[in-house]
């Protein structure tokens, strides 16, 4: 049943109907459309469009429909309705007859879909935050279990300074904490109710929109009807958050792929998140991580698509805005699936502590400690930096680590070097010295883990 047929003398061509209809994807808004309709029915009682008895009858029928939708949402797709709003109204009329035709009084599909998508986005924010927090908890648990796993830290993918696997885990805890916080901010901004804005100029019925907003669990009503029906900022914002978080997940996945490589051999991924080769029987491929990395472009693409769709639209509603749904549905589903898969990857991750330590001992990652040591002996840092660079070149030529050089060898480059240099060149000293807040010292990492466990409890 179309909601707009009276103006037309010809039926829509099937090709146009197939092109125009959105039920195949906006059926996902069924619960929100029903919730919004219940709220609207209560508002219509207060302006004498519906009696209390009529409202109760409508609410009962809508709640029955809600139960049906929750039990089998896919059944909606068997219908020929144009969109989810048409489907709900048609089913309501089937249940209560002509009374169902009164519900749309004073309401437009423009404000109806606006409230539906906001309700859906609010619900998804809560679900996404649960997944992000769960990933953070797994990262913290992994960190707690790997505090003794010393490994190289990298810049430019070159060994830089020693860190621990725990410190690496906690870096991602911080990234995902910002994603969690952004979701909270987005929720607060989208927590305004557009219902009652009509097609664009507001409704002709003096509904109490603030009361309606509270009935639908919004903080307050939107302030401008034109903006209300054309606003898709919340979709863009969620797509932006999803894109940034996927970038974080992609970096996590890339690190894991490198750490899992035969060349690094820092970690071993579980058989449950890897796959084999149809040709090479020895292969164990990090497909879970590769797919997380690969799906990042898909989510970022949805953000780009939405921005391009919106950029040239005049106020207020335009049918272009129907294109908002498939992108946000797919992007948030993909994001949550990737968050959950990253959590699963951590579940049975094995860290090769001996191998990470062996790698940390190579690459002259204690060179900065030698430079700081020279500074403590009165050598200006810029000079000490140059001296250590020359010392490293010498050590490379000799095939030695800095800690393996003799005092006479050190003194070829600086006379201030004494026997106390060896203590500061040890891995443990390298870690212990990084004791400022946020540093890699075991004490600071343990504090960060304890604080995060308390925060996420």
Swiss-Prot record:
It catalyses: 2-(N(omega)-L-arginino)succinate = fumarate + L-arginine. The keyword Signal does not apply. Its EC number is 4.3.2.1. It is found in: Cytoplasm. This is Argininosuccinate lyase. CDD domains: Argininosuccinate_lyase. Its main location: cytoplasm. Pathway: Amino-acid biosynthesis; L-arginine biosynthesis; L-arginine from L-ornithine and carbamoyl phosphate: step 3/3. PANTHER family: ARGININOSUCCINATE LYASE. One of its GO terms (cellular component) is cytosol. One of its GO terms (biological process) is L-arginine biosynthetic process. The keyword Nucleotide-binding does not apply. One of its GO terms (molecular function) is argininosuccinate lyase activity. InterPro entries: Arg_succ_lyase_C (IPR029419), Argininosuccinate_lyase (IPR009049), Fumarase/histidase_N (IPR024083), Fumarate_lyase_CS (IPR020557), Fumarate_lyase_fam (IPR000362), Fumarate_lyase_N (IPR022761), L-Aspartase-like (IPR008948). Belongs to the lyase 1 family. Argininosuccinate lyase subfamily. Pfam families: ASL_C2, Lyase_1. It comes from the Bacteria.
